[in-house]
Amino acid sequence: MGWKSQNTLKGENNDMASKRKMVFGYRMEFGDIIPSPNEAETVQYIYATYLTGASFQHLAKELDKRDVPYDAGKRWNVNMVARILEDSRYIGTEVYPALISAEQLQAVQERRKQKRSIP
């Protein structure tokens, strides 16, 4: 991966990138972005559990209870869960390998849209 690609990735998601340096679920190995096994499993768990009806709050508490690491010294919160559930990179791009299916992402987006439209 060239200099330009690395800089583009670095600035792609500033709030997460500045703290994590890499999108949750991935790591850099020999210049390539590959799934980080434990984090990728957590991403898959978040999508699957949300699609069974769990709330952001429930997911954040469950991940904390299970001592799933996010960043050193940080506890999971609803914003972290929301960012993961909103991130389309998890279905795969030229740079990021797929961790979830496009159907899962679409189902999550539909559920979120329905929740927002309920009075």
Spans of features found by a protein language model:
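Conserved catalytic breakage-reunion loop centered on the nucleophilic residue
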Residues: 1-119
